[in-house]
Amino acid sequence: MNIFADFSDRIINAVKALELKPKEGGELDLSRVAVEPPRDPSHGDIATNAAMVLSKAVGENPRALGERLAAALAEDPDVAEASVAGPGFVNLRLGNGFWHARLGEMLLLAGDYGRSKMGNGHKVNVEYVSANPTGPMHVGHCRGAVVGDALSNLLAFAGYDVTREYYINDAGAQIDVLGRSVLMRYREALGEDIGQIPEGLYPGDYLKPVGKALADEYGTKLLERPAEEALKIAKDTAIDAMMAMIREDLAALNVHHDVFFSERSLHAGNGGTIRSAINDLTLKGHVYKGKLPPPKGQVLEDWEDREQTLFRSTDVGDDIDRPLIKSDGTFTYFAADVAYMKDKYSRGFEHLIYVLGADHGGYVKRLEALARAISEGKLHLTVLLCQLVKLFRNGEPVRMSKRAGEFVTLRDVIDEVGRDAVRFMMLYRKSDAPLDFDFAKVTEQSKDNPVFYVQYASARCHSVFRQASEQLNVRKFDREAMKAALHRLDDPGEIALIRKLAEYPRLIESAAQALEPHRLAFYLYELANQFHVQWNRGSETDRLRFVKVNDPELTHARLGLVQAVCDVVRSGLALVGADAPEEMR
């Protein structure tokens, strides 16, 4: 249960019970009433601005109205204290019984605690990674992969019908370059001295196995084929090999996709799919023949000093109109984007989310304009831009390139620090802020390493249960027995920990609404910190120990609290895409 949504209903009902009468010409706008945690926890558990936002409409002093509202809310059996602070904020402190009941619900729901129906099954498409199939994934791809995957997990947990998609850029000039690069490696595999790879081709050694595979399959016969046919074979083989490599990299990072969509499929049949999409835009009045003015102070993709077929994107929010068909009759890159978005819309998605690198910032307005044009304003589109990741080791910058044609790959990073560290740390900053990734920091066992600190909380929870099992000679602890004893929890630290656990459903919904999966990582660190603090208090003060052999009922109550922490940490880490270990190794 989202306790803040619950108390929002209670506060609105209390406001209605006051029978406030708006002044002539005024109205009570209850949508402005906010219910949230107080900025200062010492002020209570729930805070509302209701008196402040409604006072003007009813012509009453906000503090006086706050006093009336506080008096009404004090009648609620779950409210231990209702007070007014500042100009009219109403703060509520909830009784221990309320928190015991919430903890009981957590134990009942277990791994489903925090799951929401907020999304109501709305269809969302999240496109992320979509790295060109021209080589292995490098660390620059990593952040978008983690953000997109964790966001998809979060949205699904919040009740949305999520499709995770990868757009394979397997058409265009970079694929021709890939094919020519592989043909060089093919000749090398046949024993030819190819010398230095020419500038403009891909020089990486990762293409050598592809060249060898062609040599093994075709021998010298590929040299006898027409150049265009040989290039097509090389391109097809290379794309398959690169995508297999990329899929392996994604699997190593625990990143998943439901759909891999090929750009080449849009160009099949003489580009019939693209032509159909452009025709649809034409019928809606969004396409015309014309000549764009020369760009001022910038390089404009696909600009020609000739008449082209153009998308009238300035009518739907873009800065400039966009070329669709060049003067020679060939499609622009953007033309394929038109067909691809139309395909997504035809699949019934209500919200399209693109997770892109910061260098794609120029795409935002054109994609938003395209969504408006295709759907006539019905399609919701969001672009999340991920800023750069900088690598460090003990505070010293790490070179992103290892040697000519080679770079620090995603697999290099995973092999050194582990998948969980990579995933958690990629979410430990908001995606639009630059991220510093220090190999030494993410492997140290200290509070300063967030992923260790959170996973250590999971391991400690399990160690408490192992200790309790040994000392009480109980093989397995029953959740109902733990739930029945929760009334014994009265230490302020215990109540504070329950309060933190009770924030989880609200955190899920707010993070999903804001499309900000980094909030999960922040919350997990805060929860882990409170748990470690309570564990340390027990190690220093005997009466606060989780396991009290001479008081089985209190032990069951405290184990219920530990179980809830364990459940939420496991749930949150699963959404992040990391494991919740039972032991630290």
Curated annotation (Swiss-Prot):
Its main location: cytoplasm. Disulfide bonds: none annotated. Keywords: Aminoacyl-tRNA synthetase, ATP-binding, Cytoplasm, Ligase, Nucleotide-binding, Protein biosynthesis. One of its GO terms (biological process) is arginyl-tRNA aminoacylation. The keyword Protein biosynthesis applies. SUPFAM superfamilies: Anticodon-binding domain of a subclass of class I aminoacyl-tRNA synthetases, Arginyl-tRNA synthetase (ArgRS), N-terminal 'additional' domain, Nucleotidylyl transferase. GO terms for cellular component: cytoplasm. GO terms for molecular function: arginine-tRNA ligase activity; ATP binding. It catalyses: tRNA(Arg) + L-arginine + ATP = L-arginyl-tRNA(Arg) + AMP + diphosphate. SMART domains: Arg_tRNA_synt_N, DALR_1. It is an enzyme of class 6 (ligase). Gene3D superfamilies: Arginyl tRNA synthetase N-terminal domain (3.30.1360.70), HUPs (3.40.50.620), Isoleucyl-tRNA Synthetase, Domain 1 (1.10.730.10). It comes from the Bacteria. A motif ('HIGH' region) lies at residues 131-141. Its EC number is 6.1.1.19. It is found in: Cytoplasm. Belongs to the class-I aminoacyl-tRNA synthetase family. Monomer. NCBIfam families: argS. This is Arginine--tRNA ligase. It comes from Chelativorans sp. (strain BNC1). The lineage of its organism: Bacteria, Pseudomonadati, Pseudomonadota, Alphaproteobacteria, Hyphomicrobiales. The gene is argS.
